[in-house]
Amino acid sequence: MNKRTRRILPQMAVPLLALAAMPSLASTALVLHNANIYTGAALTPRAEAVVVVDGRIIYVGSGAEALRQAPPDARKVDLGGLTVLPGLTDSHAHLSGIGWRELYFDLTGVPSLAALQQRLRERAANDKGAWIVGRGWIESRWSPAAFPVRQDIDLVVADRPVVLERIDGHAIVVNSLALNVAGITRDTPNPPGGEILKDPMTGEPTGMLIDNARPLVEDLVPLPTDSETKLALETGANRSLRVGWTQLQYAGTTDTEIRLLCELYAERRIALRMYAAMEGPGPDAERFLTMGRGEKSCDDRLVVRGIKLYMDGALGSRGAALLAPYSDSPESVGLLRNEPDVILRIATEALRKGIQVETHAIGDRGNRLVLDAYERAFAAVPVSQRLVAEPRFRIEHAQVLAPADIPRFAKLGVIASMQTSHAISDMYFAPSRLGPDRVKGAYAWRSLLDAGAIITGGTDAPVELGDPIIEFYAAVTRRALDGYAGPDWGLEQRLTREEALRLLTYWPAYAAFQEGERGTIEVGKLADFTVLSADIMQVPDARILKARVVYTIIGGEVVYREATAQER
């Protein structure tokens, strides 16, 4: 997803401020007992109780022994058989984007162009701002499954610029006035790494702007104030707690957002752990690269250690860079948003400074170019010259891979940061984009694992809903939420439930250099837990989606509790 911020209506902020309240414990000690605990640890995979003191686990095992070891003032919670997992981690998400989705014009799930137009009509009647901005539409299940064009928007709103972002964050549709304000005409050339879609008959711009063409309009949208951005960050963080995340790995942030996050932590308005990468290339990322690794921050729940880069665009908007043309658009092979030498330069310097690099790559060409750049950087900076010997560079998404590149992840020590929900969302258009042979290398979780790679699981929210239960379900079923799986949709790539759990717990901790602190329920580790109403490791596939988050616990503190939860 591209990082773009939006102005929201100030009056929308008022009812959401209540979400900031952070429940706190009267005691620093906590006992969870009569529980169904999956520790994620190889030697003792199951337990029935855990004891926490000062934010860390001091005992894991039987209920009777836990009660004996607990300090006298410990808060004791009888979970009545609820399932406890190591605190779940979203290893790829966009925090402010989650908040903006909650706060402004959300088009997620609109079933048709007509429905989008009706939603826009309603919005225009109530939004008197100079611009109308929204996000979340996807055309793949419309009839016909075609991108909207500026005339579709003009029919509803012609007197103000309108910018509507596709759900993948890599394309927008705008109305004619927005094109005029930006000075985009039939003669405007495509910017490097972007495309201005034009009508093949008239040569006029259609209103669809892909990847690096988006800023031609988006840079004209009024920027949000600090208070609006702060509210978006707070809303995104607290929404993440409600769905069970204990850490979010923020794929592309800014100096401004880091400053605002520090304020939110100091004001006790957020509790979510974060592991962040600076958005690059750009001035903030370059300053970070010059400064070197900055793991220490304003709060021990916030770590800034990486730089996020982009190689290509998205598959749905045909910006993903492919080795051969799109099967449904033979004139296109996608886009390169940055030249490989940019990735190589930053990766090489990052190795010397101890900074992790994570690069967005979706198409098979995009992934190959990133692997090539990483390999060249590793060769240029031997271990003796690195601040961190094992850099754990990542490729974000790794969606479409040529068979020859799958073993390279393990060989190079590159982590595949993947989002299993993408497979069940994209199954409606990926086969037509890729064709029957190339689609076999798409969302290739099993192939990567069998080749020795490490996969870390995230959501890419707000591109996807951002729900760990959906990610777990998608990993083990590779089916849509209604149970549908397209023909030849690669069900052999499914994961076991144990692997799916590691995808959301231990492997994200490893990807953040935190496997000694988080990712399993073991003595000495941070007391981060996600407590569910159902045993997702055992129930039938269809019942996984019925599981609810009852508690989210971070450092032994209950930071979210379901309203109906009854403590015993």
What is each model feature region?
Residues 1-7:
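N-terminal secretory signal peptides that target proteins for export/translocation
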Residues 10-24:
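Bacterial N-terminal signal peptides
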Residues 27-33, 42-290, 296, 305, ...:
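Divalent metal-binding segments
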Residues 38-39:
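Short solvent-exposed capping/turn motifs at the termini of beta-strands
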Residues 51, 197, 531, 553-555, ...:
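Short, well-ordered beta-strand micro-motif
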Residues 231, 348-356, 365-393, 397-398, ...:
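His/Asp/Glu-enriched, well-ordered alpha-helical/loop segment
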Residues 561-568:
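Extracellular/periplasmic ectodomains of large secreted or surface enzymes and adhesion receptors
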